[in-house]
């Protein structure tokens, strides 16, 4: 499974990360369809370089011709002028294998927790943290997720 490959590769590089998005919701018990695996890292070049290496080790390549150094140096421009919120990776031999590293969030400012899955302890953003992210994004799928997260947090789900 792609998630396990990524986590194992990140762990082998000693990279701190937080799983966010649809896979994180699934680990919190809120299952929904998603194509990609989303992560947040600490916003520093060394971490983005480790992620680039770790993802490359499992056959994933940046969708855009940019490197970790570019992301960190030009982050503000990418977000404000190019509407780029994530650094996307794909396995061109199997395009269903997709990973997004959000460049709008900093792991140092996030609340996370460890969830045990398949013999691994995966670092996941808390439901409250995911809720904040979803409220900021406000896309149609996010609005559905917001309702489900609030129900789960209130004990209704």
Model-derived regions, located:
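Compositionally biased terminal segments of proteins
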Residues: 1-157
């Amino acid at each position: 499974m792609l998630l396990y490959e990524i986590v194992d590769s990140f762990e082998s590089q000693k990279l701190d990360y937080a799983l966010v998005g649809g896979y994180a919701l699934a680990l919190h018990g809120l299952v929904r369809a998603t194509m990609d695996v989303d992560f947040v890292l600490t916003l520093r070049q060394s971490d983005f370089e480790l992620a680039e290496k770790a993802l490359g080790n499992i056959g994933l390549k940046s969708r855009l011709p940019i490197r970790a150094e570019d992301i960190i140096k030009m982050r503000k421009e990418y977000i404000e002028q190019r509407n780029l919120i994530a650094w996307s990776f794909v396995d061109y031999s199997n395009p269903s294998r997709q990973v997004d590293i959000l460049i709008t969030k900093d792991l140092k400012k996030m609340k996370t927790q460890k969830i045990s899955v398949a013999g691994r302890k995966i670092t996941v953003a808390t439901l409250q943290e995911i809720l904040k992210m979803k409220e900021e994004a406000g896309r149609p799928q996010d609005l559905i997720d917001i309702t489900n997260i609030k129900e789960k947090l209130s004990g209704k789900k």
